Design a protein with these regions (language model features):
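Catalytic and substrate-binding clefts that recognize carbohydrates or anionic sugar/phosphate headgroups
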Residues: 1-155, 164-167, 171, 178-183
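Structural beta-strand/beta-sheet cores of well-ordered domains, especially the beta-sheet scaffolds
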Residues: 55-57, 64-66, 117, 125-128, ...
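N-terminal small/glycine-rich loop or linker at the start of catalytic domains
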Residues: 147-164, 248-262
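Structured alpha-helical segments in the cores of large, soluble enzyme domains
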Residues: 137-150, 174-193, 274, 278-281, ...
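Aromatic- and carboxylate-enriched substrate-binding clefts and catalytic-loop regions
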Residues: 5, 16, 187-326
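Short, surface-exposed, polar/charged, turn-prone segments marking secondary-structure boundaries
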Residues: 86-90, 95-99, 157-158, 189, ...
Length: 326
């Protein structure tokens, strides 16, 4: 059942008594989600199993052989059989009513007595819901991957051993690590350089620091000869000194992050400016990029305010909430 109210969209999905559900993307602290309240929101510090995480998804699968995908970039709450509406309440057993809780844990424990998943999508005036059938959970996940586009198959080295050097690393220290690993026969496929490889961070210039890496092309050639792939750490907030800053000004949001522009990647122009510049780094010998700190400020602390707010506006018409999620 889907209902549109002044608040937004409310969705109800039936749950059987012996039904378990799993999902919501990358979740560190919970696996079986029945009886929980989940908010799969992009965030840099997953805490307490609430659903805040680096890679959330508004998708879950059921042991009954189906999956539910709520196709939205809005902050969405899933009550996974944790709450019961008045008209469907079950009569408590007499012995339960007589029980007196004597601890905080007992008093407020989750009794998992709901028979529906209640999905709350505030601000939505309509919603697209995909019901994906199995019959098995594995079949559901396979079909979800086909529906969502699947993604590319990573190269074998991308599944190998990685080592990242500290943010204050230099060309000489990187080569010392590289030589040490090979001399000691310590497996290492990828060397990651934290954002200190740039002239400015945070926000990012995307320009090599001549002070720390005076001959970076020579270093990349040497690392390639030793069998290393090189991964650069960065984020998408563009420093005033960046060569792409001016070009991105018309295609960025109305809030800064660390004095850096926030590109509106919904717009093809912003996407092209950003990727074209990064293609020059790939041509130099870089094999990949790690997008650090692109997953929102820690929403668990009032002092964590560095990221753009949910009310930010972007030229494409998207707001900050949706931009965080996409």
């Amino acid at each position: 059942q889907i209902k549109i109210t002044d608040r937004g969209c409310l969705i109800e999905v039936p749950l059987e008594d012996n039904e378990q559900i799993y999902g919501f993307g990358l979740q560190f602290e919970t696996f079986g989600q029945r009886g929980l309240r989940k908010r799969p929101i992009v965030n840099d510090n997953p805490l307490n199993g609430l659903g805040y995480t680096h890679a959330p998804q508004t998708f879950y699968v059921s042991t009954k052989g189906y999956g539910i995908l709520v196709n939205t970039a809005r902050y969405t709450t899933f009550l996974c059989g944790s709450n019961q509406k008045t008209e469907h309440s079950r009569q408590l057993q007499a012995e339960e009513r007589k029980h007196i809780a004597t601890t905080t844990e007992d008093l407020y424990k989750n009794r998992s007595n709901g028979n529906k998943v209640h999905i709350d999508v505030p601000g939505a005036k309509g919603i697209e819901v995909f019901i994906i059938t199995g019959p098995e959970v594995l079949d559901v996940v396979k079909r979800y991957n086909l529906l969502s586009g699947g993604g590319c198959l990573p190269p074998m080295w991308g599944l190998g051993f990685k080592y990242r050097v500290k943010g204050d690393a230099t060309q000489d220290s990187v080569m010392r690590f590289a030589n040490y690993f090979r001399e000691k026969q310590i497996p290492c496929d990828v060397l990651g350089l934290e954002p200190g490889w740039q002239t400015a961070t945070y926000s990012c210039s995307y320009r090599w620091s001549d002070d720390r890496f005076p001959r970076h092309k020579e270093m990349l050639d040497q690392l390639q000869q030793k069998g290393y792939k090189v991964n650069l750490w960065e984020h998408a907030y563009v420093h005033p000194s960046s060569p792409i800053r001016k070009a991105l000004e018309p295609y960025s949001g109305d809030f800064l992050v660390w004095n850096g522009l926030v590109p509106d990647f919904i717009q093809p122009e912003a996407h092209k400016i950003f990727t074209d510049y990064h293609r020059t780094l790939i041509e130099e010998g870089i094999s990949g990029f790690k997008l650090d700190e692109c997953d929102n400020s820690n929403i668990s602390f009032a002092s964590a305010t560095w990221c753009f707010p949910d009310m930010a506006q972007f030229p494409s018409g998207i707001d900050g909430e949706k931009m965080h999620q996409v």
